[in-house]
Amino acid sequence: MNAAAEAEFNILLATDSYKVTHYKQYPPNTSKVYSYFECREKKTENSKIRKVKYEETVFYGLQYILNKYLKGKVVTKEKIQEAKEVYKEHFQDDVFNEKGWNYILEKYDGHLPIEVKAVPEGSVIPRGNVLFTVENTDPECYWLTNWIETILVQSWYPITVATNSREQKKILAKYLLETSGNLDGLEYKLHDFGYRGVSSQETAGIGASAHLVNFKGTDTVAGIALIKKYYGTKDPVPGYSVPAAEHSTITAWGKDHEKDAFEHIVTQFSSVPVSVVSDSYDIYNACEKIWGEDLRHLIVSRSTEAPLIIRPDSGNPLDTVLKVLDILGKKFPVTENSKGYKLLPPYLRVIQGDGVDINTLQEIVEGMKQKKWSIENIAFGSGGALLQKLTRDLLNCSFKCSYVVTNGLGINVFKDPVADPNKRSKKGRLSLHRTPGGNFVTLEEGKGDLEEYGHDLLHTVFKNGKVTKSYSFDEVRKNAQLNIELEAAPH
């Protein structure tokens, strides 16, 4: 952020209103508040059973929040004054903890006396385990732990995008392996089309970066800069794209000149892959007559490295894909691969970028398999469903206090609402461990201090205003790999 933008963000104004009043609500002589974040397990699913269970989550995005919003001198005299004035009007009362913030400014030069411990970024952890913990490091600042809940819990978004994207990768990997015998090109099978479908530039950057944990294809440019700035990669960029047509570059030629539009575009990009949206008027006519006959000579002469990628963009996704493949299969030479599935020639592929979410994706690849088409023939583009059609409830992302110190005594605390057992929270100081069998287990009530459980997988990533541990994007990707990828990799 430039200096002006830096000055704009005020951590004193980046919390839920009610938290401004909480310093007055904790028990007298509270000196520590310790809280944790998890993606709660749903032990009792609603009657409307979800097709996808989301049993494990990808932990990603906390590093961005810590670096962008919490590190360094985040408290200044001006920010305290600004907050004081805003809250006086907002509450019509003097409830703001001016003294507490001045203490942080004076004693710590505006750095937050907080410690955050977290699992490594990119870790794949079963639901119901601790992912990070937060505690104050100065007894005067017991109220600060849950003040920053608001901004820290926004990590639900990159976690959920990365998790949902990875679940789609599981589906694609399974069907690609079954219909081709290998995982070649898996990381380009789901392309991010979501830039225009998200709520803001920042959302675009965060969401696109989360998808790139699992894949390498994106049209959401904002993700690239975020990854380079907050994570870093060994490659010059973490995501790639290809030249592609939109409807305007076709329809601008006029309805009677779709063939001319197609011809011009494939000629402009003859030595690289090029995607051409082909449903401006009639996708089936485009495949059969224009691509299959009129321009066939231009397509068959393209190289394996520079295929034409035909993009349908309307209609029922499964029906459209199958019909397009059927037409192309009659117009171009189809071969059978080693697994007995049909394969278009290497200079021709299809991308479905309309109506793609995790459920339609599953339907399309299953439908293709049943019709004996290899998944090698297709890639997918997903926008709103990939980056926007998600909420904090999908993975039940939750932040709760589990331990306090009052009058010098540590107390394990929790909630356990009578009407919803799913909302029961964990007790005491928490740690995360691997059992000898390789399973993850969260230990409550400080039991992780006992030697027998091995080391804690939560590492200090932030302490007293400093980010103390960072992960490169390459490490994040490695942590998030699928088991099927690890098994298929050459040993």
From Swiss-Prot:
<feature type="binding site">
    <location>
        <begin position="311"/>
        <end position="313"/>
    </location>
    <ligand>
        <name>beta-nicotinamide D-ribonucleotide</name>
    </ligand>
</feature>
<keyword id="KW-0202">Cytokine</keyword>
<dbReference type="InterPro" id="IPR041525">
    <property type="entry name" value="N/Namide_PRibTrfase"/>
</dbReference>
<comment type="pathway">
    <text>Cofactor biosynthesis; NAD(+) biosynthesis; nicotinamide D-ribonucleotide from 5-phospho-alpha-D-ribose 1-diphosphate and nicotinamide: step 1/1.</text>
</comment>
<feature type="binding site">
    <location>
        <position position="196"/>
    </location>
    <ligand>
        <name>diphosphate</name>
    </ligand>
</feature>
<feature type="binding site">
    <location>
        <position position="219"/>
    </location>
    <ligand>
        <name>beta-nicotinamide D-ribonucleotide</name>
    </ligand>
</feature>
<comment type="subunit">
    <text>Homodimer.</text>
</comment>
<dbReference type="InterPro" id="IPR016471">
    <property type="entry name" value="Nicotinamide_PRibTrfase"/>
</dbReference>
<feature type="modified residue" description="Phosphotyrosine">
    <location>
        <position position="188"/>
    </location>
</feature>
<dbReference type="InterPro" id="IPR041529">
    <property type="entry name" value="DUF5598"/>
</dbReference>
<comment type="similarity">
    <text>Belongs to the NAPRTase family.</text>
</comment>
<dbReference type="Pfam" id="PF18127">
    <property type="entry name" value="NAMPT_N"/>
</dbReference>
<dbReference type="GO" id="GO:0005737">
    <property type="term" value="C:cytoplasm"/>
</dbReference>
<keyword id="KW-0963">Cytoplasm</keyword>
<dbReference type="Pfam" id="PF04095">
    <property type="entry name" value="NAPRTase"/>
</dbReference>
<keyword id="KW-0539">Nucleus</keyword>
<feature type="binding site">
    <location>
        <position position="384"/>
    </location>
    <ligand>
        <name>beta-nicotinamide D-ribonucleotide</name>
    </ligand>
</feature>
<protein>
    <recommendedName>
        <fullName>Nicotinamide phosphoribosyltransferase</fullName>
        <ecNumber>2.4.2.12</ecNumber>
    </recommendedName>
</protein>
<keyword id="KW-0007">Acetylation</keyword>
<dbReference type="GO" id="GO:0032922">
    <property type="term" value="P:circadian regulation of gene expression"/>
</dbReference>
<comment type="function">
    <text>Catalyzes the condensation of nicotinamide with 5-phosphoribosyl-1-pyrophosphate to yield nicotinamide mononucleotide, an intermediate in the biosynthesis of NAD. It is the rate limiting component in the mammalian NAD biosynthesis pathway. The secreted form behaves both as a cytokine with immunomodulating properties and an adipokine with anti-diabetic properties, it has no enzymatic activity, partly because of lack of activation by ATP, which has a low level in extracellular space and plasma. Plays a role in the modulation of circadian clock function.</text>
</comment>
<keyword id="KW-0328">Glycosyltransferase</keyword>
<keyword id="KW-0964">Secreted</keyword>
<dbReference type="InterPro" id="IPR036068">
    <property type="entry name" value="Nicotinate_pribotase-like_C"/>
</dbReference>
<keyword id="KW-0597">Phosphoprotein</keyword>
<dbReference type="GO" id="GO:0009435">
    <property type="term" value="P:NAD biosynthetic process"/>
</dbReference>
<feature type="binding site">
    <location>
        <position position="311"/>
    </location>
    <ligand>
        <name>diphosphate</name>
    </ligand>
</feature>
<keyword id="KW-0808">Transferase</keyword>
<dbReference type="InterPro" id="IPR013785">
    <property type="entry name" value="Aldolase_TIM"/>
</dbReference>
<keyword id="KW-0662">Pyridine nucleotide biosynthesis</keyword>
<feature type="modified residue" description="N-acetylmethionine">
    <location>
        <position position="1"/>
    </location>
</feature>
<dbReference type="GO" id="GO:0005615">
    <property type="term" value="C:extracellular space"/>
</dbReference>
<keyword id="KW-0090">Biological rhythms</keyword>
<feature type="binding site">
    <location>
        <begin position="353"/>
        <end position="354"/>
    </location>
    <ligand>
        <name>beta-nicotinamide D-ribonucleotide</name>
    </ligand>
</feature>
<dbReference type="GO" id="GO:0005634">
    <property type="term" value="C:nucleus"/>
</dbReference>
<dbReference type="GO" id="GO:0047280">
    <property type="term" value="F:nicotinamide phosphoribosyltransferase activity"/>
</dbReference>
<dbReference type="GO" id="GO:0005125">
    <property type="term" value="F:cytokine activity"/>
</dbReference>
<feature type="modified residue" description="Phosphoserine">
    <location>
        <position position="472"/>
    </location>
</feature>
<feature type="binding site">
    <location>
        <position position="392"/>
    </location>
    <ligand>
        <name>beta-nicotinamide D-ribonucleotide</name>
    </ligand>
</feature>
<feature type="binding site">
    <location>
        <position position="247"/>
    </location>
    <ligand>
        <name>diphosphate</name>
    </ligand>
</feature>
